[in-house]
Amino acid sequence: MVMEDEPREATIKPSYWLDACEDISCDLIDDLVSEFDPSSVAVNESTDENGVINDFFGGIDHILDSIKNGGGLPNNGVSDTNSQINEVTVTPQVIAKETVKENGLQKNGGKRDEFSKEEGDKDRKRARVCSYQSERSNLSGRGHVNNSREGDRFMNRKRTRNWDEAGNNKKKRECNNYRRDGRDREVRGYWERDKVGSNELVYRSGTWEADHERDVKKVSGGNRECDVKAEENKSKPEERKEKVVEEQARRYQLDVLEQAKAKNTIAFLETGAGKTLIAILLIKSVHKDLMSQNRKMLSVFLVPKVPLVYQQAEVIRNQTCFQVGHYCGEMGQDFWDSRRWQREFESKQVLVMTAQILLNILRHSIIRMETIDLLILDECHHAVKKHPYSLVMSEFYHTTPKDKRPAIFGMTASPVNLKGVSSQVDCAIKIRNLETKLDSTVCTIKDRKELEKHVPMPSEIVVEYDKAATMWSLHETIKQMIAAVEEAAQASSRKSKWQFMGARDAGAKDELRQVYGVSERTESDGAANLIHKLRAINYTLAELGQWCAYKVGQSFLSALQSDERVNFQVDVKFQESYLSEVVSLLQCELLEGAAAEKVAAEVGKPENGNAHDEMEEGELPDDPVVSGGEHVDEVIGAAVADGKVTPKVQSLIKLLLKYQHTADFRAIVFVERVVAALVLPKVFAELPSLSFIRCASMIGHNNSQEMKSSQMQDTISKFRDGHVTLLVATSVAEEGLDIRQCNVVMRFDLAKTVLAYIQSRGRARKPGSDYILMVERGNVSHAAFLRNARNSEETLRKEAIERTDLSHLKDTSRLISIDAVPGTVYKVEATGAMVSLNSAVGLVHFYCSQLPGDRYAILRPEFSMEKHEKPGGHTEYSCRLQLPCNAPFEILEGPVCSSMRLAQQAVCLAACKKLHEMGAFTDMLLPDKGSGQDAEKADQDDEGEPVPGTARHREFYPEGVADVLKGEWVSSGKEVCESSKLFHLYMYNVRCVDFGSSKDPFLSEVSEFAILFGNELDAEVLSMSMDLYVARAMITKASLAFKGSLDITENQLSSLKKFHVRLMSIVLDVDVEPSTTPWDPAKAYLFVPVTDNTSMEPIKGINWELVEKITKTTAWDNPLQRARPDVYLGTNERTLGGDRREYGFGKLRHNIVFGQKSHPTYGIRGAVASFDVVRASGLLPVRDAFEKEVEEDLSKGKLMMADGCMVAEDLIGKIVTAAHSGKRFYVDSICYDMSAETSFPRKEGYLGPLEYNTYADYYKQKYGVDLNCKQQPLIKGRGVSYCKNLLSPRFEQSGESETVLDKTYYVFLPPELCVVHPLSGSLIRGAQRLPSIMRRVESMLLAVQLKNLISYPIPTSKILEALTAASCQETFCYERAELLGDAYLKWVVSRFLFLKYPQKHEGQLTRMRQQMVSNMVLYQFALVKGLQSYIQADRFAPSRWSAPGVPPVFDEDTKDGGSSFFDEEQKPVSEENSDVFEDGEMEDGELEGDLSSYRVLSSKTLADVVEALIGVYYVEGGKIAANHLMKWIGIHVEDDPDEVDGTLKNVNVPESVLKSIDFVGLERALKYEFKEKGLLVEAITHASRPSSGVSCYQRLEFVGDAVLDHLITRHLFFTYTSLPPGRLTDLRAAAVNNENFARVAVKHKLHLYLRHGSSALEKQIREFVKEVQTESSKPGFNSFGLGDCKAPKVLGDIVESIAGAIFLDSGKDTTAAWKVFQPLLQPMVTPETLPMHPVRELQERCQQQAEGLEYKASRSGNTATVEVFIDGVQVGVAQNPQKKMAQKLAARNALAALKEKEIAESKEKHINNGNAGEDQGENENGNKKNGHQPFTRQTLNDICLRKNWPMPSYRCVKEGGPAHAKRFTFGVRVNTSDRGWTDECIGEPMPSVKKAKDSAAVLLLELLNKTFS
């Protein structure tokens, strides 16, 4: 307890946190914190009421202190001794409490297995503690000093290749450092801005994260219980699941199971009898048998309908431990390839799917029947006729050898799926047929007592209703409309009725939808859709009444008017006119009846109201609710009397009213038609008496108003949970739907089959349920059906038990027989894939749907029948198939067959065979998308890792070194001998072309060097001239010159190597001794000094005198000359959590550094090391000895330095090291007019009191140094900068004035604090240029080496340009060449594919091109050729440059040969890191050893380099050179000249078509005359044009697109040679885009010659032409594709197709094509006329100003609305039918609004400044308008520097939001010297990290102002 009269600081022990943290791993510290049990600490004076030490970090200090001293864990928290650590136990109650606290579970929710896991974690932590203590005891036993720190062991850990992971680890370490920083004070609260009240700074207890999480939980608290339950379910043991399932089985279920184990079985049991449980038990039995054979099980569970997929899969998952996969059509399995399916088969044990999916993958040989172990068929009675169940069995099961067939288990509530059975024999025949089909035996229950006990049957109630009065006039009117539509459709198509409805009558459309999920929504369906809608209205009129029919018609009309797609259908007006007429007719009739007032009120709504809100597909519009005063019976009664609602509907409503007070009411109403299911809930919603009902519809997939699976699942879930109490459903809900809460089932429409009767009854699962059958009074057929259904059910049950003997049956034709030989099929022997007559029609439709097309084209097969009359009146048929014009063939005649259906199947089967033979089908009999065998390369990463070829995919690659630099001679020289070797001396010449405005003499006082190589360099390297950016406005050129060859002895070589190491260790700030330097033979060259006389012979040109002087001097014995500046200066706040003074002392003493370290900078003002520490280290002479010589030496003109006396004038030009700060300075002059007693200068702009009186006072107060020689003149010096990258322009982006830029900053130093450096200033300045020069030389040598590999002569400098990325920030990069290479590669590959594959359509060609030119493929090519070793991708950093004999700074602390005293006890890496990598093996992506020779490259960079190489070779050597390079890379695109002739020969156009085209006008517009007219015809023919033997333009568009792209890119590249790559890319994008080409087509009237057959396209073209004409009327306006009207893509396509046609017609002459198109494309975009897309302009503006940009889009009917928000404030909005156009307009409006706002603010600021007078004069310095200083992080940093505090500590407390509108929230605190750590201040969420830190800094400044004021 802290005494009141004693300061708090006095009660806290000195913390050992720093010492412990620096030689104890972060993992161990975390373990100790977690092991520290507060409950075990006795409550005493030093603890609070909870038993926790008041100063938490003091308690941790106690633990760490004990560990460091070898005493183990202290006895007051964890344990007494080492041996007791493993005996520490924690009670389960405590663990359970902690688990509840962390996971949010219930208090009793902990499980025993969780205890063991947590105890295991604690054991591992204790093991690490023991290991650490053992290590410490070993070290201390050897006599090492206790307070010495161990080197950072974790620098040796293996590095992963995943760059993102490295970043994450860095963040974790920073987080750990942040936690350490809080050692002095426990965090008890935080400060933030009051968001509700006065916006003042408010204090809150706790942590920001906890408060924020609590707020979030308040919002989502309702879901907590569900989460807990889900967690509990996950924690259930697997054995428990198995046992529960076994215990649930009833005796009759086990009986059926035993039979199913013995043989194939069909379980014939009532709904709710538990058939699924039997299937689950059977799956487990099969799995157990296979496990005994070490085989994996694959069971397939088939269901007939989509809802059952989800239901059954969930049941199996809950009841078993198997991996279960579920599959239905909406999941897109039709487009899965075999590899995706194989992954599913390997990872799953049970597959639940619809039968059609299994049939598909069997037919395409993705799976084989013999690989399935168990096949379960739910509702197996469907296995009749052509149902997928039946086809699976007949086509695949029965054709598989018996010993390889899977076991079969069928489940059904009725084995007969017909209207009923006429007799016992009839029933027996139907059951036998099902058994034969499924190769199984029906099994049912003989004793039904147990079944009746567990499966209660609902009460069956029959309700009669009166027959509805027929509305003859309305019915006849609608029928006449239907007939008129059919007649109009027949007339327009000029086809027979079969042809118009042929696909539908032949069943192709239904099969197509079921088999491949293709939904035919095209223009020609308009008439059929209208007929369907009129028939639905007519049905509703008859069955539900006029009121409902009006609602249906109104909904159809509303949906048609608001559907965006109708704009592109040819007969929109046609449909709208008919529907409007019907709605008007029904409306008039309603106005005359009892509901006239209601309808009139409804009709009288304003047109701009919400009567026609946007609806989901398949929904009806909501209508207003009837006023509460009306009684339902009065409304319905009046409606029935007037014929507006049928008695059937009235009876249904009365039935529902009877259940008004029924508890937990849940009902299903079954209807026959979808339209009834949709309209009845709307009727119920309008009746107030049915307000107790919450109603929803449930419809299936096979209709025009289909319901998505997700919607269906949502509806079922709501019904199960009670959010929906009434389902109006079609037959989709009859089978298998398991809703145990359902207590009422109503058959609004009587079932059509016995099965439907039984199945729908089974939906009433709750005991005491009602099954209500509504029958028409007096309807004989209804009564007969009910009798037949009841009798048939009993007959079926009896037959299943008694088994009638059919051996004496005379008519055996009714019994089916299964033929093991498949019927007429086409089978691919290579894969086993097959197509039969049953699947051929659907496959042809699927193929057509995959052909490339647009919304205007109708891509589906057309069939025409021909009758063949045979003698005897028999008629046969043959079918003619016509495929779309972009298929490999168009017409195919089929064989003569007995029926139209069979004829259609036969011709489709023949078409499938032919398509496969022509390559349109793969060997899996799926449409070939152009993938081929290369598809394997394009596989996606299933684990979510970045895909190769993208910028996010990064890898480590070894840095390349040219072979010419390699030499073993650098490793010699250890033994002194006189033998000599031949070397080559190269002098580097640096000449200043122009000094500019610089007058600095230092820039010209530079020593020269030469470079010694073991091999001769290439001549191109010597001819290279490089720019060095030494100073602003100074132009410096550097080059190499060969000076000759010379022999050097081993002794001389040894001296040169020592000189080289001494020189580079200073230049690169690396402390290294020449004797311990490792020399890499990969870099064999040396830097040597040269004499002024360059005309001497090479051996005499070396300055041997300087070499001897530098290598023999004793000055190097002083560590101050070797130590890097960071010894004293330290680094940023993330370097260490401790005292930087101790850091500096440790660096001096032991040459080791603890903790994380980053490269130091001079950006931190002021020194941080105490001079006393330096003096105490013994590294400086005793300064007392100086006093005796001071007077004598000063009189001789000498200066007393820290290391002796020196003549003052000799110091000029030297380098001195400041002992008090460790910094180095060039000596500019000696200031004889200044001394230590000179007044210390006042800071510029500072008006306060002087901080220091004299220089002596400054050094005394700042560094604690008493100067002895205060009368000595001061040394004027300038800082020695770090070695910089001189290859990058560093002075262009500064916005400061020239005066500021040219200003040199000097310091004035007392000589007695300076040590003279052995190396002169001119020598260092010259040497600092060497790294940059060698970087360029090394890069150039690599380029020469690559050039030799490619073996084609082009300038090496161009190859270097292609290898240099923009990230290098040099004066050249590959981006311009990459742009040209990309276009050239695309053109060459497109030409090659077009000519080589004349049968491939445009979609296939596009995919094949993508596989040849994609970044992933180019990346793989680059790896094969080793380009990763030649690429320059990083900005050159000398500190990371690996000079010969000098390791880089980056790996300073992990290098060999260091002087650490821990080196005696080195452990293997695998042993040290055993806590991280338990197996001791390197993980994928990790690298061992030194990482300095590795660099990170993205795979996109490698791909870009390939394109850049193609570009430079094309520029320098034309097509021949580019093609040579592509061939070397691996891209083979050589084409045969004869292929062009073959292509032209394939263009055969009928004479009638040629005569219909105005070639003269079109060729006049193009100014080109075609030799082959057929190419021009094809180029202007759209796919919507009815086929006339002419292909569409798609293939020509494919090649023309590449031709124009290449030609325009080439034109821009060579026209604007100095344009930056980014601007060149923008120019290309503006010139090469479909919108621009479309305007070219309109400008030259090419659209007038377009051959198409779409009225919607014609309409859109007219609108676009009008818009372009309006644009053209504006003087000087050219949108270059950025106009306000989006062009039809077809117009741009024909420009590209015509370009392709000209290219082919001219014999592949691109010059001819450019000659035609250059004038057509005028005016061409230029840098001056280049428009910027508003979206991009706004994005860039927001990025520059760090503002959050967000777009919000919504759609209402046919209009899209896009809103623009900046920092949450709306700044723009626009509406357009097209979303992208609306976004562009909204961005444009936002930009205009922002500009207006800026102008207004500028004016207001001008007015305010004018009125403010002189008081506001300070604003010119950047202050805010109110005169207050704008606080930022820099303000806080300045305060910390003045107060001598550590830098503030920031942390990100939250990062969230979408990618385009991220928000960052930061916290900050600072460690004050006298009061410890401040509370954390949390800033506001900001769109950038900088602004977020600024926001937090402002709060902390306010807090500091309050605290210290």
From Swiss-Prot:
SMART domains from the UniProt entry = DEXDc, DSRM, HELICc, PAZ, RIBOc
Q: Which parts of the sequence belong to the Helicase C-terminal domain?
A: 651-812
Query: Motif span (DECH box)?
Result: 378-381
Q: Which tissues show it?
A: Highly expressed in flowers and seeds and detected in leaves and stems. Found in ovule integuments, inflorescence and floral meristems, stigma of flowers until just before pollination, vasculature of the funiculus, and embryo.
| Cofactors named for this entry | Mg(2+); Mn(2+)
- Chief location bin: nucleus
Keywords in alphabetical order, please.
ATP-binding, Endonuclease, Helicase, Hydrolase, Magnesium, Manganese, Metal-binding, Nuclease, Nucleotide-binding, Nucleus, Repeat, RNA-binding, RNA-mediated gene silencing
Any idea of its EC number? 3.1.26.-
Q: Does the keyword Lyase apply?
A: no
Q: Which proteins does it associate with, and in what oligomeric form?
A: Interacts (via N-terminus) with DDL. Interacts (via DRBM domains) with DRB1, DRB2 and DRB5. May interact with AGO1 or AGO10 through their common PAZ domains.
Entry function: Ribonuclease (RNase) III involved in RNA-mediated post-transcriptional gene silencing (PTGS). Functions in the microRNAs (miRNAs) biogenesis pathway by cleaving primary miRNAs (pri-miRNAs) and precursor miRNAs (pre-miRNAs). Functions with DRB1/HYL1 and SERRATE proteins for accurate pri-miRNAs to miRNAs processing. Indirectly involved in the production of trans-acting small interfering RNAs (ta-siRNAs) derived from the TAS1, TAS2 or TAS3 endogenous transcripts by participating in the production of their initiating miRNAs.
* Protein name, per record: Endoribonuclease Dicer homolog 1
